[in-house]
Curated annotation (Swiss-Prot):
Location of the region described as Disordered in the Swiss-Prot/TrEMBL record: 40-60, 75-108
Keywords of the record: ATP synthesis, CF(0), Hydrogen ion transport, Ion transport, Membrane, Mitochondrion, Mitochondrion inner membrane, Transit peptide, Transport
Protein family membership: Belongs to the ATPase h subunit family.
Protein name: ATP synthase subunit H, mitochondrial
Length: 108
């Protein structure tokens, strides 16, 4: 009967309980920590009294008087590509802006 018990004990694998010393020391210190009691007087020097901010000044717009605004409204509008005189050079073809120069002497 003794041999049967010895054989049954050896059939089970056992793991060694490993201790994590750092984790245990940390949890022990956290549990032992007692926070100091604070009163309202302790916070007086640490907190500034609240005061409402001052109202912001409105922005100043350049040329806000009526004469400057009227002059701006009456100013001619510049449009790109528009010519002022009839004697100007004829308008370029739309495809001229992307013209590739043909290379000479290239054999295909």
């Amino acid at each position: 009967m003794f041999t049967l018990r010895a054989a049954s004990r050896r059939a089970f694998s056992t793991s060694i309980a490993r201790r994590n010393l750092i984790s245990e020391a940390y949890t022990r210190e956290v549990r032992a920590f007692k926070a100091p009691k604070l009163s309202a007087k302790d916070a007086e020097g640490q907190v500034k009294p609240w005061s409402a901010p001052s109202a912001p000044k409105p922005p100043v717009v350049e040329g806000a008087d009526a004469a400057e605004l009227q002059a701006y409204a009456e100013a001619p509008v510049d449009v790109e590509g528009q010519t002022n005189s009839k004697s100007a050079s004829p308008q370029a073809n739309d495809e001229d802006w992307l013209a590739f120069e043909e290379e000479e002497g290239v054999a295909v």
